[in-house]
Amino acid sequence: MKILRKNHPLLKIMNHSFIDLPTPSNISSWWNFGSLLGTCLVIQILTGLFLAMHYTSDTTTAFSSVAHICRDVNYGWLIRYLHANGASMFFICLFIHVGRGIYYGSYVLSETWNIGIILFLTTMATAFVGYVLPWGQMSFWGATVITNLLSAIPYIGSTLVEWIWGGFSVDKATLTRFFAFHFILPFIIAAFTLVHLLFLHETGSNNPSGLNSNSDKIPFHPYYTTKDLLGIFLLLLALMILTLFFPDILGDPDNYTPANPLNTPAHIKPEWYFLFAYAILRSIPNKLGGVLALILSILILATFPLLNNSKQHGLIFRPITQTIYWIFIANLLVLTWIGGQPVELPFTTIGQIASITYFAIIIILIPISNAIENNIIKL
């Protein structure tokens, strides 16, 4: 009898992707975060769908509709906080996933890596427009400040900002279109995820040793499905603890005040997962320069395959680059902390030093350390 999963036209695709997929036998728990990101995406789409059933994208009722969800809808408070904290878990998994890719040299699979960068940017755009929807003070002023950055683009800047706003300020038209974007973008992310997997399965997964693992592969199921399920349970446990015990720990108290265009909050800042990029933006006094630095802080990830001059794959046998890598991670944490601080001394100076360090490590220090390690191998 023919095995259905191996012959059915649809099940065959699933089988080659999740069941009989040849996988390196030594991939560690750092490889779990891809499946965790998929889980986060499903959670976000489902909770978002139920929130959209009760939310109204109108400036007069948006804030009260979110309050109505939390007070009057059955388990509305749970759905809302799962969605808000699910976004934080999403970005934690995303940062770890990218960090693992850098550490173990997964960027040599350049198509997969570049689709990953597009996914990262799309996820950031989705989170930004989503943060505007509750129409609290930080939602309104965050939208105003960040969209206004586009006015730094020469010639077309002002026109572009008014086009995005749908008027001369952030108002009803802006909120409506942001809701439309926030609804459609997760499905675009899901589509790009399939492309990401398609490219990954063309080459096969990387592994911690950085060596060719073609001679030692095992089927994805049951070994890695079980391993992924454990990761998913731990993720759900962390998400439920965060949601049920500390629902507002990652939010901003200002967002519990309805949006008021006449009253500016003392410190306008985005969600925690954007703070590193926000700190880089603020560290440059020139508006256009700041915007370029902000964009480059993400796009610079695309230079990893181009600047890779190492004879070894990954950092596991490269102590000098390993040290630089962990300095880079520490620097990112410093940038995140600075992004949440007011614009005053000494924070501005620390932010500028950390921003320069961020770019210098990727463009200068890592290629130099690679060259040094290549020469050490020859000795």
From Swiss-Prot:
GO biological process entries: mitochondrial electron transport, ubiquinol to cytochrome c
Gene Ontology CC terms, in alphabetical order: mitochondrial inner membrane; respiratory chain complex III
Membrane topology type: Multi-pass membrane protein
Name the UniProt record assigns to this protein: Cytochrome b
Keyword Secreted tagged: no
Residues where heme b b562 binds: 83, 182
Species of origin: Akodon azarae (Azara's grass mouse)
Binding site residues for heme b b566: 97, 196
Pfam families: Cytochrom_B_C, Cytochrome_B
